[in-house]
A protein has these predicted regions:
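N-terminal Rossmann-like NAD(P) cofactor-binding module of classical short-chain dehydrogenase/reductase
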Residues: 32, 47-50, 72
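A short acidic, Gly/Pro-enriched loop at the edge of an enzyme's catalytic core
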Residues: 40-48
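Terminal peptide-recognition signature
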Residues: 4, 23, 49, 61, ...
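Glycine-rich phosphate-binding loop and adjacent beta-alpha segment
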Residues: 52-122, 156-158
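Short, polar loop motifs at secondary-structure junctions
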Residues: 15-19, 37, 55-56, 76-78
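Short acidic-hydrophobic, aromatic-tinged amphipathic segments that line or gate anion-handling sites
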Residues: 30-34, 131-134
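C-terminal hydrophobic helical "lid"/dimerization subdomain
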Residues: 107-158
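Mid-domain Rossmann-like dinucleotide-binding core that forms the NAD(H)/NADP(H) cofactor-binding site
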Residues: 1-33
Length: 158
């Protein structure tokens, strides 16, 4: 979201009620509470959908994509990853809509740009909680339940 904003995008964040304020603080122009509104049926269309949760079928978002829109799966459940791998390319051949996956490949220029954005204060990490290694199971449980607001960090030593 923060990177999209630096590129001039109008950003709509989709999150639960508990995370709305954080999403706004990261620069979202619009915030949709998925517990009250379904972005797949609300009539809005988007040029790009970045799906970091992958809690529902990839293709549920078809009607939310603009005619030449791009759906990008960024992590999530293995079931959705397989769905994208097997059907994304085939589905992309129909019409102008594209379905793809994002796989990060660290490279020096991109990392330098991220460091520059952090130095400028344009990009900031959101750390919601820190857990010592001895409490890693609790940290994972919080993430699995979707209760984490920001990143959960496991500290190995102080």
């Amino acid at each position: 979201m923060q990177i999209a904003k630096t590129m001039g995008a109008t950003v709509t964040g989709v999150c639960s009620t508990a995370k709305m304020e954080m999403v706004r603080s990261l620069g979202a122009d619009h915030v949709v509470d998925y517990t009250k509104d379904d972005v797949t049926t609300n009539g809005e269309t988007y040029d790009v959908i970045l799906d970091a949760g992958a809690y529902r079928s990839t293709f549920d978002y078809t009607r939310s994509l603009a005619p030449t829109g791009v759906y990008v799966l960024v992590g999530g459940e293995m079931k959705r990853t397989w769905q994208m791998l097997l059907l994304g390319r085939l589905r992309s051949k129909k019409g102008g809509k594209q379905y793809t996956m994002f796989v990060a490949r660290a490279n020096r220029p991109d990392l330098a740009k991220l460091a520059e954005l952090m130095d400028q204060g344009t990009l900031r990490p959101v750390i919601g909680a820190r857990y010592p290694l001895a409490h890693a199971a609790e940290a994972v449980s919080i993430m699995e339940q979707g209760k984490a607001v920001g990143k959960v960090v496991i500290t190995v030593s102080e």
